[in-house]
């Protein structure tokens, strides 16, 4: 049985090094999809690079934890910027959901302005769309706009009927122990669960000053090395997987 594999590189637009890494992993590796941060410091650079890579499917990486929002978000920003304090607000059930709804719509429109088309799908920076308070907002928006959504089905079960997503999602290809065997173990685990479609999240990048400031730095370069391995591409095909994007879901 043929299975669909979407290898999605997060953080398109974060930095030039991140952008170049994603393009390299698409051209010479197994990355088929990416998600862009429309408020990223290198988003214009990402748009420019994407014009020469029509095979790369591009979705939107909804941002609520970094940089400046596109709308006024007094309930979520501090000194005008977003940050990881969103976790504390979520724990206190004090998230400004109306502000988040408006920001989602604004980032979506900004994506269309930048890339000239709808995103293939939605996900989010630091997985904030999986917060139980935020997920219904994002799921409803994706369903209404007719675009797919990254959804970890181990965390949510109540999905809109017309929402497109994969049967499986994995964030396990991450950390200090990145290897081909780890990637293939993710696929094997998915196969054992009987999933016919799977998204694997990744973050391939070349190191630059912005990436050096990230808590997740050098493994991004290791990811790039693994994702451009010819032997990995062969092993994926051997397991009955077809590389694709959320347009195939």
UniProtKB/Swiss-Prot annotation:
In which pathway is this protein known to take part? Glycan degradation; chitin degradation
Where on this chain does Mg(2+) bind? 61, 125
**Could you give one GO CC term from the UniProt record?**
cytoplasm
| Catalytic class of the enzyme | hydrolase
User: What's the source species for this entry?
Assistant: Escherichia coli O17:K52:H18 (strain UMN026 / ExPEC)
- The primary site where this protein sits is cytoplasm
Q: What's the subunit arrangement here?
A: Homodimer.
- The molecule here is called Chitooligosaccharide deacetylase
The protein's location, in the record's own words, is: Cytoplasm
Essential cofactor(s): Mg(2+)
Q: List this protein's GO terms for biological process.
A: chitin catabolic process; diacetylchitobiose catabolic process; polysaccharide catabolic process
């Amino acid at each position: 049985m043929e299975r669909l594999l979407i290898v999605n590189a997060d953080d398109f637009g974060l930095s030039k090094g991140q952008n170049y890494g994603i393009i390299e992993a698409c051209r010479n590796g197994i990355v088929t999809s990416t998600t862009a941060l429309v408020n990223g410091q290198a988003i214009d650079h990402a748009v420019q690079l994407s014009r020469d890579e029509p095979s790369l499917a591009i979705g939107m990486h909804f941002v609520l934890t970094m940089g400046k929002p596109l709308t006024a978000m007094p309930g979520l920003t501090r000194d005008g910027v977003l940050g990881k304090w969103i976790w504390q607000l979520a724990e206190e059930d004090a998230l400004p959901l109306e502000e988040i709804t408006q920001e989602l719509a604004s980032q979506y429109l900004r994506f269309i302005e930048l890339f000239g088309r709808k995103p293939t799908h939605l996900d989010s920076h630091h997985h904030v769309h999986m917060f139980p308070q935020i997920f219904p907002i994002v799921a409803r928006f994706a369903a209404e706009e007719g675009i797919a959504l990254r959804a970890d089905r181990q965390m949510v079960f109540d999905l809109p009927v017309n929402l497109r997503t994969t049967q499986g999602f994995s964030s396990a290809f991450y950390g200090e122990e990145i290897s081909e065997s780890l990637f293939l173990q993710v696929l094997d685990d998915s196969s054992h669960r009987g999933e016919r479609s799977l998204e694997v999240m990744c973050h391939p990048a070349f190191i630059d000053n912005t990436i050096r400031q990230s808590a997740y730095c050098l493994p991004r370069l290791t990811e790039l090395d693994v994702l451009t391995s010819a032997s990995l591409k062969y092993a994926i095909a051997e397991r009955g997987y077809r590389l694709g994007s959320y347009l195939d879901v």
